[in-house]
């Protein structure tokens, strides 16, 4: 894409803002080098990567911090004779450690993760990273353990240091030299241990003078007894440097052997830093990723100019920039300084950003065609050097790019045809738009030409729009109204900017004389458009309020239903407990449960306004339902399991949350394949022996221990009342934690006779078989 186009759209400024979110200088440079892609498949991949980066960044799965630019290191690694210095090795170690952390974070991504796949495919400098981590300390120095030679020589250096400190202390003490010294310590000068002697005691301490302090008050003297030790220390220092050089050569060799892996890892880190910067930019202006594909319509919802959006939430007015699938052109009209040019630049800039794999400040559901080319005719393009007027410069530019314009092109025309005779300029502008449409190109044009305004309303495939203004103040509102044209209100703009009133009155008289005063008509159109916008906003607000009320009613109904279910379950448990304690006989318990079920039905109908009626009964055929099938109880909006059915009564006995009750067919509906959940939690289904009244199965997989305990107790209680002797509890394998909790609960339950892990063909250690007393 032409650099001229990107410059006119201020695309480099967006890249500068993007670069500000990068953690490293290499990534910032990569951000500034981004541009529109010519490959739709590559763009789709980049968008998928950005979607994953947004999720990872928001989940704080990986945090980017600054890392050095190691690009110059690769030239060193290409030469067999060159060795990386310590600073270069530290920089390389820092980069590879960040890559290791990135691999750890992104390597866990599973399934269709694009980033996870990229990390998996990227060659990894495993040996180099491990060796650098082993040899380099947190202070940036080579560790003693880097090599046996380095360890040995440093041990001796430390030993000599201790020897010197001991000898100096004894020397000062024996000679009572404390008052002669500036400080009671040994220091280093010229890489040798010396004593800081006061200048006025010069000659009192035999030795070699190495240096003077800046004030001249201190003389640094090496006592003769330290000369031999210092000489040995210098030898060891040389040996240390040689040992360090051998370690650095070894590490350089490893990096050289793995230079392809090092380079790939570094590129991965930089690329991901760029991705995280894109994600940060997206969050900064509340953006999204539009769908970009051949044949998609221009649809940018709540679009804002990115530079204005980044300036603050109130700095940009959101616009819906839309064309129908059969439309290719947008003609924007309205007042000077009303926002027409910003509207065009927003469309072009957001298209360039989307084609570059960047997020755009627009709403969800936005889309764009895949533009291979964007051409811009924007603002004052006159060239004094080439002796070209604005009109001539635009024509020359259009002539140059005209052969390249096709169906994959977006053209932006700002006041095209201005700067010459108005009638000829308008005719030329219409002809250019015709030619662009004939080539299948997309275009957006801003104009003041009346002929082009009428063209926008009458030409098939073209949509007209105008920038609205406040009728009272004549100031622009920077809002776009579609399918109408607007006035230029040049006189009002001139008045706003201080032109003398007598000139404006004279201009108005000339308008009346020429018969060109259409201001009242356009004012009326603007008022109607503004009223329509306000009405649409009011309707949207009213709908939102009504939806809120409906949702609140639904929430209240659900709370009431849940509360009632919990009360019924507690009553049922109380009946079971009294029956187990012998305070209630079997028949009395069954009657009490029947009363509870009746209360459940009555209060359910009261909450929901009664059963569903005849229509529901017709819609649901009870004859095709079998025991064990899942159904929806519409009056409760709950899924239950059919236990029995009575075709004569047109009712079914349904288990909901461990409570069984007869439900009229009018209150039943197909469950759409959803599993039934007891109490909104455990899935309860019959076993093969259910028809004989021998067993039930409950599925507790995925539940927390406290929820599973509640569901299991209710399940066992219900089974006891119904006379079941054998149960199956599905808890899954997993870590075994839920199985242990289930076994603990069963062990403590007074009505459980025994339990054991199911045979392998019935579920193995993922299921427990239970026998009740």
Curated annotation (Swiss-Prot):
HAMAP family: MutS2 (MF_00092). InterPro entries: DNA_mismatch_repair_MutS_C, DNA_mismatch_repair_MutS_core, DNA_mismatch_repair_MutS_sf, MSSS, MutS, MutS2, P-loop_NTPase, Smr_dom. Endonuclease that is involved in the suppression of homologous recombination and thus may have a key role in the control of bacterial genetic diversity. One of its GO terms (molecular function) is mismatched DNA binding. ATP binds at residues 334-341. The keyword Nucleotide-binding applies. Keywords: ATP-binding, DNA-binding, Endonuclease, Hydrolase, Nuclease, Nucleotide-binding, RNA-binding, rRNA-binding. Homodimer. Binds to stalled ribosomes, contacting rRNA. The keyword Hydrolase applies. It is an enzyme of class 3 (hydrolase). It holds the Pfam family MSSS. Gene3D superfamilies: 3.30.1370.110, P-loop containing nucleotide triphosphate hydrolases. It comes from the Bacteria. The gene is mutS2. Residues 698-773 form the Smr domain. One of its GO terms (biological process) is negative regulation of DNA recombination. This is Endonuclease MutS2. PROSITE patterns: DNA_MISMATCH_REPAIR_2, SMR. Its EC number is 3.1.-.-, 3.6.4.-. Belongs to the DNA mismatch repair MutS family. MutS2 subfamily.
């Amino acid at each position: 894409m032409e650099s001229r186009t990107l410059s006119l759209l201020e695309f480099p400024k967006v890249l500068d803002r993007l670069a500000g979110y990068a953690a490293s200088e290499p990534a910032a440079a990569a951000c500034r080098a981004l541009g529109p892609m010519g490959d739709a498949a590559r763009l789709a991949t980049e968008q998928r990567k950005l979607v994953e980066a947004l999720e990872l960044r928001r989940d704080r799965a990986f945090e980017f911090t600054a890392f050095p630019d190691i690009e110059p290191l690769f030239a060193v690694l290409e030469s067999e004779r060159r060795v990386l210095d310590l600073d270069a090795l530290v920089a390389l170690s820092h980069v590879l450690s960040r890559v290791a952390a990135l691999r750890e974070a992104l390597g866990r991504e599973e399934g269709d993760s694009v980033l996870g796949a990229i990390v998996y495919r990227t060659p990894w400098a495993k040996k180099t990273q491990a060796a650098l981590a082993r040899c380099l300390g947190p202070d940036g120095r080579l560790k003693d353990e880097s090599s046996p030679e380095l360890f040995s020589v440093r041990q001796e250096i430390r030993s000599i240091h201790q020897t010197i400190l001991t000898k100096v202390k004894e020397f000062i003490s024996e000679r009572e030299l404390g008052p002669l010294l500036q400080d009671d310590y040994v220091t280093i000068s010229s890489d040798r241990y010396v004593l800081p002697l006061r200048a006025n005691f010069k000659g009192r301490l035999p030795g070699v003078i190495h240096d003077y302090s800046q004030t001249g008050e201190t003389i640094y003297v090496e006592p003769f007894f330290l000369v031999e030790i210092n000489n040995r220390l210098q030898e060891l220092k040389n040996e240390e440097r040689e040992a360090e050089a051998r370690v650095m050569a070894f590490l350089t060799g490893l990096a050289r052997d793995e230079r392809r892996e090092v380079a790939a890892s570094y590129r991965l880190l930089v690329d991901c830093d760029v991705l995280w910067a894109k994600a940060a930019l997206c969050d900064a202006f509340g953006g999204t990723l539009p769908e970009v594909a051949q044949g998609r319509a221009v649809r940018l919802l709540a679009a804002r100019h990115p530079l204005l959006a980044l300036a603050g939430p109130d700095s940009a007015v959101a616009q819906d920039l839309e064309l129908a699938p059969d439309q290719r052109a947008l003609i924007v009209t309205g007042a000077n300084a009303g926002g027409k040019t910003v509207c065009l630049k927003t469309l072009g800039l957001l298209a360039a950003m989307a084609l570059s794999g960047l997020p755009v400040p627009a709403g969800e559901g936005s889309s764009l065609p895949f533009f291979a080319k964007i051409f811009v005719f924007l603002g004052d393009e006159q060239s004094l050097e080439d002796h070209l007027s604005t009109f001539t410069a635009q024509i020359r530019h259009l002539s140059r790019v005209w052969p390249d314009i096709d169906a994959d092109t977006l053209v932006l025309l700002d006041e095209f045809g201005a700067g010459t005779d108005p009638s000829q300029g308008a005719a030329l502008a219409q002809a250019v738009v015709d030619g662009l449409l004939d080539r299948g190109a997309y275009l957006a044009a801003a104009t003041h030409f009346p002929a082009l305004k009428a063209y926008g309303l009458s030409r098939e495939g073209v949509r007209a729009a105008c920038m609205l203004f406040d009728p009272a103040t004549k100031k622009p509102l920077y809002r776009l109204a579609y399918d109408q044209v607007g006035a230029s209100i040049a006189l009002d703009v001139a008045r706003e900017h201080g032109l003398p009133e007598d000139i404006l009155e004279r201009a108005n008289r000339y308008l009346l004389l020429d018969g060109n005063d259409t201001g009242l008509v356009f004012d009326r159109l603007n008022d109607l458009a503004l009223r329509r916008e306000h009405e649409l906003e009011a309707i949207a607000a009213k709908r939102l309020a009504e939806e809120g009320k409906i949702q609140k009613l639904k929430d209240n109904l659900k709370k009431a239903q849940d509360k009632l279910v919990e009360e019924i379950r507690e009553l049922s448990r109380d009946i079971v407990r009294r029956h187990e304690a012998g305070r209630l006989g079997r028949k009395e318990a069954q009657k009490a449960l029947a009363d509870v079920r009746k209360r459940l039905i009555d209060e359910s109908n009261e909450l929901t306004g009664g059963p569903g009626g005849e229509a529901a009964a017709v819609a649901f055929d009870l004859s095709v339902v079998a025991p064990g099938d899942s159904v929806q109880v519409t009056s409760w909006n709950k899924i239950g399991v059919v236990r029995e059915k009575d075709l004569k009564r047109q009712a079914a006995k349904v288990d909901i949350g461990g409570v069984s009750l007869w439900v009229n067919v009018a209150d039943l509906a197909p469950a759409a394949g959803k599993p039934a959940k007891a109490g909104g939690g455990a899935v309860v289904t019959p076993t093969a022996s259910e028809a004989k009244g021998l067993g039930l199965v409950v599925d507790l997989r995925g539940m927390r221990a406290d929820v599973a305990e509640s569901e299991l107790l209710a399940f066992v209680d219900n089974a006891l009342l119904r006379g079941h002797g054998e149960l199956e509890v599905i808890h899954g394998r997993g870590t075994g934690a839920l199985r242990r909790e289930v076994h603990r609960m069963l062990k403590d339950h007074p009505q459980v006779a025994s339990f054991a892990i199911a045979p392998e063909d019935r579920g193995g250690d993922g299921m427990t078989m239970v026998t009740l007393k």
